A protein has these predicted regions:
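Broad gene-expression machinery/nucleic-acid interaction feature
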Residues: 12, 44, 67-69, 83-85, ...
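Surface-exposed cap/loop segments at beta↔alpha junctions
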Residues: 55-146, 154-155
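Juxtamembrane "anchor/assembly" segments of surface/extracellular structural proteins
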Residues: 1-67, 103-112
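Short beta-strand-centered interaction patches in the first periplasmic/extracellular domains
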Residues: 2-3, 102-105, 109-111, 145-195
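Generic marker of residues within folded, mature protein domains
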Residues: 3-5, 37-39, 60-62, 76-78, ...
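Short amphipathic beta-strand and strand-loop transition segments with alternating hydrophobic
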Residues: 31-37, 89-96, 179
Length: 195
C-alpha cells in the first residue's frame, strides 16, 4: 500500500500544504480524512492524525492560516483531482479511552469568509448575478456567476451574512451557490448559477 492513506480500491486521498504534499512519515499517521461539501453551504475538511506527541500538524505545516488541499489520486494520475482546498482554521487535540492522542485539523473553503458578521447595504441597478460578482470580488474570491436578465433598482442585504444573502438571492431565481475548485485553474471559485 502507498504511504498515503485512505485507499479504497484504486483511490487514494493525498494531503497537500500550500501545494506541497505532506511527507510520507506524516501521511502514514492520518487516521481519517472527511470532506463535507453541499450546495448552499461552505465546504469543510477534517484531517485526523494519530499523534502521540501532538506535534504532527505543526511539523507538516498545517498551521492555522495555511492552505490545505485534499486530492483524490487514482492509478496513473499522480497529480489527482482536487476535491477540497481551504484554509486551516482550527487545531484540536482529542484523547481516546485507550490512551491514544489525536490531532485534528479543520479547514474551510473560501466561502467561510462570507459567514463572518452581518451587514446591511444596498446594491443599486444590478442583477443578482452582478451582486454575486461584487460580493466575490470584495472578498477576493474568484466568481463565476451565470448572468440573470433582471436588473433590480435596489438589491438589499438586510442584516445578513454575505453567505446567507447570496443563498437567498440564488433561491429566489432558482440558482445555487457553492465554492468548488476550478479544474482548469486549480483555484477555488464561487459559483452562482442554476443547479
Amino acid at each position: 500500500m502507498s504511504p498515503y492513506i485512505m485507499s479504497t480500491s484504486d483511490l487514494i486521498l493525498r494531503v497537500f500544504v500550500d501545494s506541497i504534499p505532506i511527507l510520507p512519515e506524516f501521511s502514514t499517521q492520518i487516521r481519517r480524512i472527511e470532506v463535507e461539501s453541499q450546495v448552499n453551504l461552505p465546504s469543510s475538511c477534517e484531517i485526523e492524525f494519530t499523534d502521540p506527541d501532538l506535534t504532527i500538524p505543526m511539523e507538516c505545516g498545517l498551521d492555522i492560516g495555511n492552505f490545505a488541499e485534499v486530492r483524490a489520486v487514482t492509478g496513473d494520475d499522480a497529480a489527482g483531482e482536487a476535491i477540497f482546498f481551504g484554509q486551516v482554521e482550527t487545531l484540536e487535540i482529542q484523547f481516546e479511552n485507550s490512551g491514544g492522542k489525536l490531532s485534528v485539523v479543520r479547514a474551510y473553503d473560501a466561502s467561510h469568509r462570507l459567514l463572518h458578521g452581518q451587514k446591511t447595504m444596498g446594491y443599486p441597478m444590478m442583477s443578482y448575478s452582478e451582486v454575486a460578482e461584487a460580493v466575490g470580488a470584495e472578498h477576493a474570491i474568484v466568481t463565476e456567476a451565470v448572468p440573470h436578465p433582471v436588473v433590480h433598482e435596489m438589491v438589499v442585504q438586510a442584516n445578513e451574512t454575505y453567505w446567507d444573502f447570496l443563498v437567498r438571492l440564488a433561491k429566489e431565481i432558482g440558482y445555487v451557490v457553492n465554492v468548488a475548485i476550478n479544474p482548469l485553474t486549480g483555484t477555488p471559485t464561487l459559483h452562482f448559477g442554476p443547479t
